[in-house]
From Swiss-Prot:
Species for this entry: Yersinia pestis
Function according to Swiss-Prot or TrEMBL: Involved in the degradation of phospho-AI-2, thereby terminating induction of the lsr operon and closing the AI-2 signaling cycle. Catalyzes the transfer of an acetyl moiety from 3-hydroxy-5-phosphonooxypentane-2,4-dione to CoA to form glycerone phosphate and acetyl-CoA.
Underlying gene: lsrF
Quaternary context: Homodecamer.
Catalytic reaction(s) noted: dihydroxyacetone phosphate + acetyl-CoA = 3-hydroxy-2,4-dioxopentyl phosphate + CoA
Protein name, per record: 3-hydroxy-5-phosphonooxypentane-2,4-dione thiolase
Length: 291
C-alpha cells in the first residue's frame, strides 16, 4: 500500500469537458442493464449492429440430421467464421471448445421431437446453467396460433423474467402453427407479441411480401432464420433482401452446413450483413472462395 506522503495530486481532470457516455445504439436496447447490453454487444457487432449466427441446435428435436452427424467434424471448422454460435448445452459442453471464444446463444426450450407435436415445448435450461456456461443469450420457441400457444408464451415469459434478474437476453424464435399461413400478417403478429412480452431479440422468417413491415413493427432486433436448404444464390438473395428491409442479422443453419462449401457461404453471408454487399457480389465471393 502506498504511503500517504507518496500520493500525488491528479492534474488532468478535463474540467469543462462533459463526461462521455456513448449511447448503446442497438435497436430497442438503450435502457437495458449494463450486463445485458454487454452480452448483446457480443452478439451484434457494435460497428454495424448486425450479426451472423451459425445455428446447429437442430438435433434437439431432429436428432443427427444431415450435416450434423458429427459436430466436431462438420461444424467445428466453421466456428471462427461466425459471429455467434447457437446450440444446446449438451453440444456446447461435449463438443464446442471453450477456446473457440465465440458468443453463444443457448437453446433453452425443448422436450419434444419430430415424432410428436413440435409446439409442445418446455423450458429446458435453468438460467443459472446458462450463466454458468457464459452464454450471451437464451433462445426459446414461441408458437402463436397453435394448440400449445399459451405454454410457449409462458416459457419465454419465464426466461425473460429470469434473464432480467441475471442480465441475460432472451431471443424468441417464432414457430408456425400447422394451420397458419407463412405471411407478413402472421410473422408481424408473432414477432410483436414476443417483443411485447419483453424478448430482447426476435428470430423469425423472411417473407417475400411485406417483410419490411415485420421489421419496422418490431421494437427490438430481428434476425432471420435460414429455413430449409436453398441453392446458394437464392439463400444469399434472401439474406440481402432481409437486411435491406430492416433485419439486424441472420441465424442460418442448413443453408450453411448443408452447402458444399460452408466456409465460403459464411464469408458470403458476412459480406452482405456487415459490408452491405448485394446478393450478386456475395455470390461471386462465394464462387471465388469455393474454388
Amino acid at each position: 500500500m502506498a504511503d500517504l506522503d507518496d500520493i500525488k495530486d491528479g492534474k488532468d481532470f478535463g474540467i469543462g469537458i462533459p463526461q462521455q457516455n456513448p449511447a448503446f445504439t442497438l435497436k430497442g436496447s438503450g435502457s437495458l442493464d449494463w450486463g445485458m447490453q454487454s452480452r448483446l454487444a457480443r452478439i451484434f457487432n457494435p460497428k454495424t449492429n448486425r450479426t451472423v449466427m451459425l445455428a446447429f441446435d437442430h438435433g434437439y428435436f431432429q436428432g443427427p440430421t444431415t450435416g450434423l452427424e458429427r459436430i466436431d467434424i462438420n461444424i467445428a471448422p466453421l466456428f471462427e467464421y461466425a459471429d455467434v454460435l447457437m446450440c444446446t448445452r449438451g453440444i456446447l459442453r461435449s463438443v464446442v471448445p471453450a477456446a473457440a471464444n465465440r458468443p453463444v446463444v443457448l437453446r433453452a426450450s425443448g422436450a419434444n421431437s419430430i415424432l410428436t407435436y413440435l409446439s409442445n415445448e418446455a423450458v429446458a435450461v435453468a438460467m443459472e446453467d446458462a450463466v454458468r456456461l457464459n452464454a450471451c443469450a437464451v433462445a426459446a420457441q414461441v408458437y402463436i396460433g397453435t394448440e400449445h400457444e399459451h405454454q410457449s408464451i409462458k416459457n419465454i415469459i419465464q426466461l425473460i423474467d429470469q434473464g432480467m434478474r441475471y442480465g441475460m437476453p432472451t431471443m424468441a424464435v417464432t414457430g408456425v402453427g400447422k394451420d397458419m399461413v407463412r405471411d407478413q400478417r402472421y410473422f408481424s403478429l408473432a414477432s410483436r407479441i414476443a417483443a411485447e412480452m419483453g424478448a430482447q431479440v426476435i428470430k423469425t422468417y423472411y417473407v417475400d411480401s411485406g417483410f419490411e413491415r415485420i421489421a419496422a413493427g418490431c421494437p427490438v432486433p430481428i434476425v432471420i432464420a435460414g429455413g430449409k436448404k436453398l441453392p446458394e444464390r437464392d439463400a444469399l438473395e434472401m439474406c440481402y433482401q432481409a437486411i435491406d428491409q430492416g433485419a439486424s442479422g441472420v441465424d442460418m443453419g442448413r443453408n450453411i452446413f448443408q452447402s458444399d462449401a460452408p466456409i465460403a457461404m459464411l464469408k458470403a453471408v458476412h459480406a452482405i450483413v456487415h459490408k452491405n454487399e448485394n446478393a450478386a457480389a456475395a455470390y461471386q465471393l462465394f464462387l471465388h472462395e469455393q474454388n
